[in-house]
Amino acid sequence: MKIVLNGQAIDTNCKTLYELKREYFEDKENIVTIIEGFATNDDVELHENIEVTFIEKGKLPSKEVFEHMLCARHTPKVHEKVKRARVAVAGLGGLGSNIAISLARTGVGTLHLIDFDVVEPSNLNRQQYKISHLGMFKTDALKKEISEINPFAEVITDRVRVTEENLESLFKDDDIVCEAFDNPEGKALLVNGVIEHFPGKKIVASSGMAGFESSNTIKTRKITNDFYLCGDGETSARIGRGLMAPRVGICAGHQANMILRLILEEKDV
């Protein structure tokens, strides 16, 4: 029987998962077992082309096996598509840093990170940075973080402010653009610019995720065939209403998941 074990096609005479596990690890107990994206301790009958992953806890695998292990919990056949995608994340604050990390964990092959700012203490309440990153450019800090999570992702950085003059050259090679700015003017400039210069290019933007209002008011809406908007559309940051990690993270999750759906050619919200 032909199966896929840790990303490699093999022939086996084993009929069940337990038989296969014993063949490779005898009676070791520190083995994580994943079948077609699902972790299980149960015995399972093997069948042709089933995908099985064994991970020995505490042991660093070879580079060839490591990439497969990173995506072992993915839904089957997702990784082949996402690793070919190139996504731009414009703005690396509370939304953008969380979105970029999510996409890196998902296995997106190329991430294009754009921001001109540096990490400062007030960023740490909602952004994916650490004390050790203070004073670093956000592009550099986030690239370093991603390298520790998914070393197979190519990370391209541009330490610039997006303007009408550079927008077309910045985003011409990206499959999908993610708007993650924190000011209305920047949001409008990017969304309108992508729609104008790149007909057919998908853009996922945000509006309304400040404060600590209900999580359930944050939605993903399809505005046009190529423009998606995440948030509640109302709760912008202002005096007396700040940006908090939980709701910012929820909105970032909406954006990252919509980007994943678009990569997988799922166009409905």
Regions found by a protein language model. Give the residues of each.
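Eukaryote-biased recognition of intrinsically disordered, low-complexity regulatory segments
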Residues: 1-10
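Short acidic beta-strand-loop surface patches of small beta-rich interaction domains
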Residues: 6-7, 30-46
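Glycine-rich phosphate/adenylate-binding loop
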Residues: 25-26, 32-38, 172-176, 180-269
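N-terminal charged helix/coil linker that caps or initiates catalytic domains
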Residues: 42, 53-87
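Glycine-rich adenosine-cofactor-binding loop
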Residues: 75-118
